[in-house]
């Protein structure tokens, strides 16, 4: 203790002991706090000696601060202690902890800019898990639970969509291989995806080992070893080795390398989930441009290409693959157009409507010019017209081709078009007032955001006003102007000055004009009649009258007449910036826009019954009074259907709006909260309160610019009157953005209260609030009232009927007591007959109960739901399901409670096996006091064992613990250390093993048999194999032993995989207690090496039984068809009569030819009758053919006469390549110069050898030259220019260039000159590599295509000729000739004809005549007199 107490001494210790723990509190810091902090630092793996210096405290603060958000109360206390000590070391006086934290925050804010600049200079990310400690050593900082939780949520929500890759890249910034494996382990449940990822990692690791061979000899002292592929993957390297490699000089970035491998694998997985190619994305003739863009970018994200290539694809393919209408517009915009400009320009383009508009525009221009010719002799020079839309002269707005300008062309306001504008024509002050209105509108919206009151009020701009109010919470956020506020609890009557006379007048925002009682005003007036509620009255109209309202001056029209009350109308109120403010939360609105290029919903309202219309009118009238909705006019073109339903067991109606269409057009919102809070994560508190926010969504304002899209209409019966139109001012129920915006807004509102009361725990989920504290009940309730007042100031009410003050508290489906919690009471129904829906609800209730009731099982009940059943189908309960339900009823009879979390104690998770693949677990801190319980019964693969299932349970519990408590528990597992260790050493995800201990809770988990790692000396060796015929389903399985024994059995209705397993079962049956088995089946090896103890396959279960009986078993794999002794013998044995076996006969010749030509495996399999696996093995064993992948071809125009030409460069020389698009056939030559003359000569040679109709080239100077154009003209060749990767472009030749260079690389050493190697490569490509359509080589394919083309043309001629004939025919024994029918085909014995249907008529009953263009009439023998063909 002495060493730890030496952190402070002398005067500093005195200063320390004068600092208060809390502002105004009695308790102060003591020496014991330093001792406690030293011990805590050791728990967090930090050096306690750091507390002795300023720099050391700064280091601790940097380490602890990022974890405060998810950390425990102990962590926060430690941080507060170190922060206070930091200022004592600097001899800076602080009174209490809060002041120390405030000063620390100020200092960090001052240095933030400097720190950011330092980061930019270094160019190094500060998010690395490897950090430098005080001693200068590089240490590892594990990934935070928050990061792992975010990664898990991404996979759960996005599956393996393209967004997963950038998210993984961001979350794993600077991670070590161990960190990356931890991330993979947390999503290890996706086995198919993980297997693909594993295969990719293994391939890349093998490639790394091949490219980085091990250095011979021992490693010199002081030098670290080079990492192998498995080291980079984190399976054979320690964390310290990884850190050493990553921080050495020069560094070996094993983390980044491994991350690159994982991203390669993720790309493959994404490809599997998103198999569409970017080349396939084309805009349909009538498809809206915005939908096409959505599809394009969705597929683009999945493309495996660099960002530069993706940018290029966006610039070119997006335009090229648009439909002709949109493409014309996009090309007119130019190459620099943004996506938003494209969307705007193409809005509404496409389909018959667009074509009609274009035609109308053309017709109107023709008509106008004709009219001008007729009127040319009358008036003088024609007035120049100007477009409202683009501002240019010479055309009208309706004929304008520019993108339509937003808003009305008359008044400039948005939300309606000029034809719907309600502005009156005779508005002499329109331009002046419009500018003032715009200013007032802008001004008032800013003020509304900052200082909107909590009751309905009228605001008027003013300089001085004693009525101005500002709340404490909002002080400092308002505008620099002072706005008077006039509440509407009484009539808003103010004193105004008109023409120097004072009058009391009502501020009426619903009146258009200002009307006063008899008052003498100077100036001229004119009579006018105005309509009011009581009828029409005669008034005098005075123009340009000056009026002063609340210190503001306005000039406008005043009407004087017998009005019952003086009214100041909108013509004056708008000039002084008067606004009407509703009781909506004054928080800043979240800006929302529609998806780019989309417009709002325009869905018609469907008919409603009379009672529903009355209910909706009543509901909406009340909502309008409360300011939640506003009436709108016909200028709003949008609409969403509305309807009403009755509450369950009630006569009250509920209004529902069908926002599905608006939701489609609204961008996605990121859910602020990733899940619901769990009571097991709550800390025990002395006082607790549960609140509910009333009308939660309706208390948060909706973005003003977005409100128009929420419009809806209440119809009338029999269309008696126009529908009543409304739009929402607040967040609507059913709109996709409401939950996220509400959560975000509520978090901002609660932030000041949280800051002010850090010792109070406040859980917020939607409109449910849980508040806990360690205060006495009186103080606690005072704080609750303070919270309620705080919420009320922001417009949120907390109804008394949902204000829970006394336990038990009902919260989020749970029942909370002061020192325990449970789920709310669960009653299981007792039914004679169960429907599918009943069982689904029952399983849901049991799953909910399982989080606190241990031992709940649902496996047998879930089995009842297998298959596709209707919800109302009756399902009989099986005996097992009835037993399971009865056991669950017994469990639920006894009430069970969970306790609350204590951060000072460790978490312990205990797992038990229940049998039949079901598991249960409890998480606790003290024995018999569970925090929560759970169950697991998911079987992820057909063949599994208990150890594998146990690891899945451990994974689930660990993930659950990270989410609820932010840390993993210590596990107590029913398995021996040796069994667990044996399994994990073989299991591929052995990178993260949780802390655990053995607990002897029967039944224990064990491995029922163990496979040997080395052959058993002295044991008999069985070579096993199986074969099956795919067509007949007949098969054989057997074995051959090293002692001369052999056995073969015949099997029916089987497959190759089953026969391989049957052969292993046969060997196990006929062998002794020790046996060596050799198979060539990876399938069978994979199943048995996983050591399953149960399987869905009966055959695998039989093999497991045999394995358990054996003392020792060794299982090995050898490749098939390689001439390996016993394997070859047994293969011939089981293949007899089943399949044709060709072994070594052609292998030598194939290998010899491959060394010369490096032909692909398809060509060798075809030419030498080799099995594909053997041919692939020959290619795999060739060191020059280890280039990954083959050229991928997009969809291009594959007409027989189309060729693509391009120049490529190699060894400083130019190779001119021509590719026949349909076949892939290549012609190539090394040319002396990239000139038009050489290119034209090459084209003429090509045309002399093959039929060339069209050539596609790029825009190179040699291809665009006059010489090439002349050659093409002479040879009657059409020349087209394209863009790479685009249909009818250069994609094929670009990929063939790569393929050609690859082949040249393989044969280059066989030729002295490059031109020789080029021709060798052309020969190999055209005749020695097979594949693609028909399995031909390119040379065979081009000949086949040309021959087929000739035959097709000839056949077409015959068809055309045949179609000139008509057929008269007789049916069965009827003597009457029928017809004429159309001749489709003429054979030797019959003809095929088409009349009302297609028929086959014998040749002897048909008369074929030539169609001379006139109808043959009558049923006589006219047909017989015609010439028969």
Curated annotation (Swiss-Prot):
Residues 14-33 are annotated as: Interaction with membrane phosphatidylinositol 4,5-bisphosphate and RNA. Mg(2+) 1 binds at residues 692, 767-768. Pfam families: Gag_p17, Gag_p24_C, IN_DBD_C, Integrase_Zn, RNase_H, rve, RVP, RVT_1. Residues 1196-1346 form the Integrase catalytic domain. A zinc finger (CCHC-type) spans 385-402, 406-423. A motif (Nuclear localization signal) lies at residues 26-32. A lipid is attached at residue 2 (N-myristoyl glycine). Keywords: Activation of host caspases by virus, AIDS, Aspartyl protease, Capsid protein, DNA integration, DNA recombination, DNA-binding, DNA-directed DNA polymerase, Endonuclease, Eukaryotic host gene expression shutoff by virus, Eukaryotic host translation shutoff by virus, Host cell membrane, Host cytoplasm, Host endosome, Host gene expression shutoff by virus, Host membrane, Host nucleus, Host-virus interaction, Hydrolase, Lipid-binding, Lipoprotein, Magnesium, Membrane, Metal-binding, Modulation of host cell apoptosis by virus, Multifunctional enzyme, Myristate, Nuclease, Nucleotidyltransferase, Phosphoprotein, Protease, Repeat, RNA-binding, RNA-directed DNA polymerase, Transferase, Viral genome integration, Viral nucleoprotein, Viral penetration into host nucleus, Viral release from host cell, Virion, Virion maturation, Virus entry into host cell, Zinc, Zinc-finger. Its cofactor is Mg(2+). Residues 105-124, 439-479 are annotated as: Disordered. GO terms for molecular function: aspartic-type endopeptidase activity; DNA binding; DNA-directed DNA polymerase activity; exoribonuclease H activity; lipid binding; RNA stem-loop binding; RNA-directed DNA polymerase activity; RNA-DNA hybrid ribonuclease activity. Residues 12-19 are annotated as: Interaction with host AP3D1. The active site is at residue 508. GO terms for cellular component: host cell; host cell nucleus; host cell plasma membrane; host multivesicular body; membrane; viral nucleocapsid; virion membrane. The record marks 983, 996 as: Essential for RT p66/p51 heterodimerization. Residues 7-31 are annotated as: Interaction with Gp41. Residues 73-77 are annotated as: Interaction with membrane phosphatidylinositol 4,5-bisphosphate. The record marks 128-129, 359-360, 372-373, 427-428, 435-436, 483-484, 582-583, 1022-1023, 1142-1143 as: Cleavage. It catalyses: Specific for a P1 residue that is hydrophobic, and P1' variable, but often Pro; Endohydrolysis of RNA in RNA/DNA hybrids. Three different cleavage modes: 1. sequence-specific internal cleavage of RNA. Human immunodeficiency virus type 1 and Moloney murine leukemia virus enzymes prefer to cleave the RNA strand one nucleotide away from the RNA-DNA junction. 2. RNA 5'-end directed cleavage 13-19 nucleotides from the RNA end. 3. DNA 3'-end directed cleavage 15-20 nucleotides away from the primer terminus; 3'-end directed exonucleolytic cleavage of viral RNA-DNA hybrid; DNA(n) + a 2'-deoxyribonucleoside 5'-triphosphate = DNA(n+1) + diphosphate. The keyword rRNA-binding does not apply. Residues 1016-1139 form the RNase H type-1 domain. Its EC number is 3.4.23.16, 2.7.7.49, 2.7.7.7, 3.1.26.13. A motif (Tryptophan repeat motif) lies at residues 980-996. HIV-1 lineages are divided in three main groups, M (for Major), O (for Outlier), and N (for New, or Non-M, Non-O). The vast majority of strains found worldwide belong to the group M. Group O seems to be endemic to and largely confined to Cameroon and neighboring countries in West Central Africa, where these viruses represent a small minority of HIV-1 strains. The group N is represented by a limited number of isolates from Cameroonian persons. The group M is further subdivided in 9 clades or subtypes (A to D, F to H, J and K). This is Gag-Pol polyprotein.
